[in-house]
Curated annotation (Swiss-Prot):
Residues 1-26 form the signal peptide. Pfam families: HPAT, ShK. Optimum pH is 6.0. This is Peptidyl serine alpha-galactosyltransferase. Its main location: membrane. Residues 611-637 have a biased composition (Basic and acidic residues). Residues 415-449 form the ShKT domain. GO terms for molecular function: glycosyltransferase activity. It is an enzyme of class 2 (transferase).
Amino acid sequence: MVAVFHGPLVLGALLLLLALQHGASAEEPGFANRTGVHVAFLTDCQMYSDWQSVGAAFSFKMSGQPGSVIRVMCCSEEQAKNYNKGLLGMVDTWVAPDATHSKRTGDRYAAYNKPEAVIDWLDHNVPKHDYVLVLDSDMVLRRPFFVENMGPRKGLAVGARYTYMIGVANELAVRHIPHVPPRNDTLAGPFGRRADQVGGFFFIHKDDLKAMSHDWLKFSEDVRVDDQAYRLSGDVYAIHPGDRPWISEMYGYAFGAANHNVWHKWDTFSMIYPGYEPREGIPKLMHYGLLFEIGKNYSFDKHWHYDFDVTVCPPWDLKDPKRRTHGIFPEPPRPSSLRKVFPKNGDMASMDDFIGYYKELLAIETLATLNAAFCDYHISHCPPSEQLVSVCKEVFSLYNEAREFIQEAEASYDCQDFHPKCEEWKESGECTKNENYMTENCRKTCDKCNKIEKFFPETTTKELEEKLAKMSKELQPLSEDPDNKAGAGSAPKTESPLVIPKQEQPVAIIPRNEVPPKQEVRASSPAMQSSPPPSPPPASPPPVDSPPPMSPPPESPSPDKPPPKVVTRKALADPKKVTQKALMVRCYKLSLGIDEVKDCVKAAKEGKEYEVPKRTKATDEEEEAPKAKHAESHLTLDGEGATTESANDEVAKTKAPDASAEGNEGKKNIRVVQRDLEDLSLTQGDGKKGKAPVIDAPVVGPSLHSLLGRLNTWQALVLWLVVVVAFLALVPRIAKLRRRQRSGMRTE
């Protein structure tokens, strides 16, 4: 009886579910049924490319792009063998051989890796989808590329506009592809061209890409060694005889495609550079290949970060507000700090203001996406730590705020016409005949603002934030332990107090008889660079005006002294039950320096509990001597906040002989550490940074500066009066001698 009614009930439920799904798809037409695209971003094995790859992979995940993604990476055998396993498994990856050195021409050129990567990938694999979107690793994908809207097909690809490729329509094209007839359209360049002026990204059918990939490499090599290319290519880096164009690879692609009858149509708005005004539409792709600024106090250039290592786990040194080598990039301004502006109908001034506001939001979103990508990687590959939790919470907060402001701005910007012929096309019925294109470019004229979805990707960092919350709970029991209260690593009151390492003790430098106001020493912003055309930069990074590195901590006591005693902290738990993970977490909770944390982690991996060294009395007395001498330095702050030392401080700092010292016969030279005067605290420096100069000061008695400092106001006034009177008494004699010299008299 039950079975009789069970079948119809299930069938009815299924029909109801299908009806609901059909209704949902009617409200959001075709989003789930879009054609999949295989996104391939091309890169190499350098550390400089690793952080870009992390950003590219994360941006694909957050863009809502239908399809799949692959990283095609060119590496030498040695590089591939030693490549970081965490980075290798981060995203689907194909490793191709390194091709920077051409076997055919003998030329060395890093961009040969782009065609070689595609050749090797397609020679051994078949893309999962019919259409491939080829990107560089220094791009952030922010909106999906839809085949139905952009219209690529076999024989016709889509690419960004690069009009400085003048060689497609001059003698350069004739020298390399004379058999290709001139074109009589302007879809991707001027009339009479023999190839298309495209670059940046390529939205192309997989069969076309495979067919022309070998010629992509061949023509890149040919243009590179063409002795006339310097005057025909339009490359601003190649203007003298013998110069080899940096954009040879772009010509290789254009000539290779034309040689296989693959042509393009321009897409003028899908890809822009941060800092450029998005006047032709809503960009889908941000290419951060050039220097850009946000407001007046923030700037970013990827070339400043050749040494950024995305694989380094906390602890991170994030003090430098301009340049960092690990962790996250300096945080951009928050969108809430900008003045909101929205366009008004018929008001061009308000539209200009809105474009400026939207431009700033896009730049902020680009940096926020990169930092969110780094946190995504660290959460999956680093042990729990309070710094990781606190830093990444702030990163995700900024990322979500940027997307919220972007979505609000683009809701207004979406209901616009981005082509001057929209009205004309509407009259000819194109709003119905060519609905996808008109929805993309003539939304307002065709009355599509509220009827067609705007394709803003509804992706969030909720899952990552949940992982952070779980990580924070794992750290909570440690923070409640009396030995590790709030993660500060403070010792229990019943035991001897923890000795704070010398390099972590702040030193306040106060001028005599004066309490200085609290001032912040900030690094200046990077120098503004002129923006070259959107072509790859030279291999070596440009100079960066970053602040000098902080000095290392004072040197350890000499070997002839007895080793310092150590104090062992109270065990967190039964030693037999302490796991390796708990030991590693303990390292990040203790109040240790960076080097000590590294030693602690190393000991934890071996299953040992790290012991914090305790300073002996003799060691503390010896370290107090250079500190006392350093406190006598007379520091001044100039108008820009930089600290300088007065001329009197050039006199060597000395210390009276210590007759009680053993083994030095009553004499002992104290090694005085001169610290970077821009650093007003004795903080621990990075081990990779340069050492501070050390001077052995001889024993010569009290310094002139210390003697003058003991005078009161009246004594100082009398001293200066004596100096002035003496100087005035010498003036007539000096004048008399000068008169004798001019009159030819002999002077002794």
